[in-house]
């Protein structure tokens, strides 16, 4: 067993008290990215090692693996703690996104170790999509490279506002301050092309030797700033969703018996209270919240990120994929949008193609109308293209088969982010972030006759397996 963990449990007064203390710690999700062989996996291994998060059997296994696959001579190869795939160990690189978990007395952490190679851009984008902070590793011998710029751009494209530029392998440049200062200046010059609201910090370190990772380095007394771990423990993460209006995508209609009907999902943004008036999109029908049900019992109020079940005061038709928001909020469903796309399939994305798209719990179809440009992610220039290749990133104009309630991705990643699904293989082939909305093409409400409404209700009541939708919600049944 991890001896430091055992000591922490003893200090808290037992396992139950320790688990309660863990629940009240804040959580930081971050990723490590950079060029090939910059030391990303080694850095994560060093963080786990120096925060005493490695169990004794893991340490013993690491000694054996270092002898077989290690690249550090007689020293422990800490990268092997993270590089789990056989192909990764044989090549000495990271291919897949590897997730690791650790905690300190101040915070809990989820780490995503992402690949540095350009052909694995899609893996890196997947890792970045759920993170709050990015650690960009730079080899002190090489300085700012194209892949550094590429990963910086992808991180900011996916909404990450906190960047920590970790200038690694300072031991190989004799810990020179002028090397650190030059790379810092080069990166700041490049960062002028990135969004202006970023929090960028610089830390000189050596992941192999442990300098400035979890403890201050005696070899770089000229650096008076915090260690990398101190930055991670103290960075103030202000999530945009906390300040955004209430959005609740319905994931599941929970009806265990005739006396209960609730709508389950995760509150994407804002907050909701018992008694609050809400509106359902796309139907526009209003009601009020009767109960907020959670695993731990009913609550009076829920905040962004909480998994809840809402019970309403009125019996109205709500299905998976519908969006609940405050009754006084205005969000016009749109059929046309400009989407930043990260393409993940071998077959290029081209105008005229159609795909299934999934947004939160909503699934529909969309057609690619045009590709405005592809971004050269090595120098951030835009160029005209006829198609978007594997790992390509570009701005694409799309039309949806039905109006969707969308937000701009930078404001709300849940209701502004979507995935592309191949209809035949059901494989995810791309990720999209809403950049612009065009509400002019929204379909006007359709007026149905009383007979049509009665027939629709009859079909939904007696033939539920047809999965017919409520016409009042502008949803058309499908056999």
UniProtKB/Swiss-Prot annotation:
Keywords associated with the record? ATP-binding, GTP-binding, Nucleotide-binding, Nucleotidyltransferase, Transferase
Residues the record lists as binding GTP: 34-41, 113-117, 168-171
Q: Does the keyword Metal-binding apply?
A: no
The biological pathway it contributes to is: Sulfur metabolism; hydrogen sulfide biosynthesis; sulfite from sulfate: step 1/3
The EC code for this enzyme is: 2.7.7.4
G4: region residues: 168-171
This protein's source sits in the domain of life called: Bacteria
Q: Which PANTHER family match?
A: TRANSLATION FACTOR
Describe the function of this protein.
With CysD forms the ATP sulfurylase (ATPS) that catalyzes the adenylation of sulfate producing adenosine 5'-phosphosulfate (APS) and diphosphate, the first enzymatic step in sulfur assimilation pathway. APS synthesis involves the formation of a high-energy phosphoric-sulfuric acid anhydride bond driven by GTP hydrolysis by CysN coupled to ATP hydrolysis by CysD.
Q: Which NCBIfam families match?
A: CysN, PRK05124.1, small_GTP
User: Which proteins does it associate with, and in what oligomeric form?
Assistant: Heterodimer composed of CysD, the smaller subunit, and CysN.
Q: What is this protein called?
A: Sulfate adenylyltransferase subunit 1
Species this protein is from: Salmonella typhimurium (strain LT2 / SGSC1412 / ATCC 700720)
Taxonomy, top ranks, is:
Bacteria, Pseudomonadati, Pseudomonadota, Gammaproteobacteria, Enterobacterales
């Amino acid at each position: 067993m991890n001896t430091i963990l055992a000591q922490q449990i003893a200090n808290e007064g037992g396992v139950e008290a320790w688990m309660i203390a863990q629940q009240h710690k804040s959580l930081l999700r971050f990723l490590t990215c950079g060029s090939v062989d910059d030391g990303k996996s080694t850095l994560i291994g060093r963080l786990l090692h120096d925060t005493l998060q490695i169990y004794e059997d893991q340490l013993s296994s690491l000694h054996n693996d270092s002898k077989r696959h290690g690249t550090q001579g007689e020293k422990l190869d800490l990268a092997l703690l993270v590089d789990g795939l056989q192909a990764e160990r044989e090549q000495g690189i990271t291919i897949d996104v590897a997730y690791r978990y650790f905690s300190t007395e101040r915070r809990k952490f989820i780490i995503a170790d992402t690949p540095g190679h350009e052909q694995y851009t899609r893996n890196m984008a997947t890792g970045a999509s759920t993170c709050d902070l990015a650690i960009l590793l730079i080899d002190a011998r090489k300085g700012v490279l194209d892949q550094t710029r590429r990963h910086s751009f992808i991180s900011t494209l996916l909404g990450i506002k906190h960047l920590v530029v970790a200038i690694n392998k300072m031991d190989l440049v004799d810990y020179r301050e002028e090397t650190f200062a030059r790379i810092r200046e080069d990166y700041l010059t490049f960062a002028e092309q990135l969004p202006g609201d970023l929090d960028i910090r610089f830390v000189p370190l050596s992941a192999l030797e442990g300098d400035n990772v979890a403890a201050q380095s005696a070899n770089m007394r000229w650096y008076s700033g915090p260690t990398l771990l101190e930055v991670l423990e103290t960075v103030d993460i202000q999530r945009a969703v906390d300040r955004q209006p209430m959005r609740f995508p319905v994931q599941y209609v929970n009806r265990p018996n005739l006396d209960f009907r609730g709508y389950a999902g995760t509150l994407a943004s804002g907050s909701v209270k018992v008694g609050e008036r809400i509106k359902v999109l796309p139907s526009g029908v209003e009601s009020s919240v009767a109960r907020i049900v959670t695993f731990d019992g009913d609550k009076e109020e829920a905040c962004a990120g909480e998994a809840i079940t809402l019970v309403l005061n009125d019996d109205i038709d709500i299905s998976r994929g519908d969006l609940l928001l405050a009754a006084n909020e205005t969000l016009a469903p749109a059929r046309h949008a400009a989407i930043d796309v990260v393409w993940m399939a071998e077959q290029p994305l081209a105008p005229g193609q159609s795909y299934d798209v999934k947004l939160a719990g909503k699934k529909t179809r969309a057609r690619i109308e045009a590709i405005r440009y592809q971004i050269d992610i090595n120098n951030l220039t835009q160029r005209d293209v006829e198609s978007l290749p594997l790992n390509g990133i570009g701005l694409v104009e799309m039309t949806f088969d039905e109006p969707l309630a969308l937000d701009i991705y930078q404001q709300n990643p849940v209701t502004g982010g979507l995935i592309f699904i191949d209809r035949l293989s059901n494989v995810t082939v791309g990720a999209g972030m809403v950049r612009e909305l065009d509400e002019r093409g929204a379909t006007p409400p359709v007026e149905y006759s009383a007979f049509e409404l009665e027939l629709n209700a009859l079909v939904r009541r007696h033939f539920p397996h047809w999965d017919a939708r409520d016409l009042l919600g502008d949803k058309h049944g499908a056999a």
